[in-house]
Swiss-Prot record:
PROSITE patterns: RIBOSOMAL_S5 (PS00585), S5_DSRBD (PS50881). This is Small ribosomal subunit protein uS5. The N-terminal domain interacts with the head of the 30S subunit; the C-terminal domain interacts with the body and contacts protein S4. The interaction surface between S4 and S5 is involved in control of translational fidelity. Pfam families: Ribosomal_S5, Ribosomal_S5_C. The gene is rps5. The lineage of its organism: Archaea, Thermoproteota, Thermoprotei, Sulfolobales, Sulfolobaceae.
Length: 214
């Protein structure tokens, strides 16, 4: 079950970068505008202000050990997925001695990775024209894992595994098929491959976009 991402209040935020200052002053008012101006997310508070209704879900909690002079040091490692269920998605990892701190670090990491997801109706079996699926087939690879996401007709649902279903739901996708290769049980590479696939929705320019680029 996803939970709401904690955010900082605008009046409590003291920007440390030029981009942050522009947002604080109201010169950039949306995440869409930030990406259109090709500006990076350099502070997690930027996401708090521009995307205040994010939700996250914990995908994996593990324990990692490191050998030190004082003996073995154990820490929690957390993997989360994050999105606003309306076209923005991310994932993040965090390590700490305390689980709560590891989750906070993962949330902060995910905020810095937020990307837009292009949605559409790309299945030849569906002509509704609504943004319920993907506009075309996309793929992503991380390590040995490769994920291919395919547009599905309206009403199909997310015909994917449980981990991927959570991720795609947070992106606002409703109807998708998938093909996977490699060690999908390694959740971090699995999610990263899916993240790269969704990132690729904006790397391909369709004929519809040609007029917008003039």
């Amino acid at each position: 079950m996803s939970e709401e991402v904690p955010v900082i209040k605008l009046e409590d935020w003291k920007p440390r970068t030029k981009v942050g200052q522009l947002i604080k002053e109201g010169k950039i008012n949306s995440m869409k505008e930030l990406f259109e101006r090709n500006l990076p997310i350099v502070e997690p508070e930027i996401v708090d202000v521009l995307l205040p209704k994010l939700r996250y879900d914990i995908v994996d909690i593990g324990i990692v050990q490191k050998q030190t002079d004082a003996g073995e040091l154990s820490r929690y490692k957390v993997l989360i997925v994050m999105g606003n269920m309306d076209g923005y998605i991310s994932y993040g990892t965090g390590k700490a001695k305390q689980l709560r701190v590891a989750i906070q670090k993962a949330i902060r990491d995910a905020k810095m990775r937020i990307i837009p997801v292009r949605r559409g109706c790309g299945s030849w079996e569906c002509t509704c024209g609504e943004s319920h699926s993907l506009p075309f087939i996309v793929s992503g690879k991380a390590g040995s894992v490769e994920v291919t996401l395919l547009p599905a007709p309206k009403g199909t649902g997310l015909v994917v595994g449980s981990v991927l279903k959570t991720f795609l739901s947070l992106a606002g996708l409703k109807d998708v098929w998938s093909r996977t290769k490699g060690s999908t049980y390694t959740h971090e590479n699995f999610i990263k491959a899916a993240y790269i696939a969704l990132y690729n929705t904006y790397r391909f320019v369709t004929p519809v976009d040609w007029g917008r680029m003039k």
